[in-house]
Amino acid sequence: MSGNVLKVQLRSEHGIAPTKGSVYAAGYDIYASADYVIPAMGQGMVPTDISFTVPEGTYGRIAPRSGLAVKHGIQTGAGVVDRDYTGEVKIILFNHSQKDFEIKRGDRVAQLILEKIVDDAEVVVVESLEDSQRGAGGFGSTGK
């Protein structure tokens, strides 16, 4: 086993440990621990009944499942799981469709992606930043 260990606590009999859908999958699927309904044009926090500790030097990013977005208009809200968070992980979902979205216990509702972090960057306040080719262009400015 490598030094990278994702420690998972199942908080009830309904919690399901994250799994990878394929050998090369970037993320681990996260499962709903209960039936839940996200109302049309609404939002909700889906229970998972799991807690986890990510490997040292990483954080867990809760990311959307592309199939939910394309097929049902479901988006995943912001989710950053720090290494020292030990509570239940819940998944924030937004329903952008005109009909209620039903989740069944055991459905995959998001994915967990482990990302490396730089935790020792020094913050230095400066008078100005160096010029770059891009400059202050943002929000699609490079795709002209």
From Swiss-Prot:
GO terms for biological process: dITP catabolic process; dUMP biosynthetic process; dUTP catabolic process. CDD domains: trimeric_dUTPase (cd07557). Keywords: Hydrolase, Magnesium, Metal-binding, Nucleotide metabolism. The keyword Transcription does not apply. Its EC number is 3.6.1.23. The keyword Magnesium applies. InterPro entries: dUTPase, dUTPase-like, dUTPase-like_sf, dUTPase_trimeric. One of its GO terms (molecular function) is dUTP diphosphatase activity. It catalyses: dUTP + H2O = dUMP + diphosphate + H(+). Pathway: Pyrimidine metabolism; dUMP biosynthesis; dUMP from dCTP (dUTP route): step 2/2. Its cofactor is Mg(2+). DUMP binds at residues 66, 79, 82, 85, 90, 134, 139-140. PANTHER family: DEOXYURIDINE 5'-TRIPHOSPHATE NUCLEOTIDOHYDROLASE. Belongs to the dUTPase family. Involved in nucleotide metabolism via production of dUMP, the immediate precursor of thymidine nucleotides, and decreases the intracellular concentration of dUTP so that uracil cannot be incorporated into DNA. Homotrimer. NCBIfam families: dut, PRK00601.1. This is Deoxyuridine 5'-triphosphate nucleotidohydrolase. It comes from Candida glabrata (strain ATCC 2001 / BCRC 20586 / JCM 3761 / NBRC 0622 / NRRL Y-65 / CBS 138).
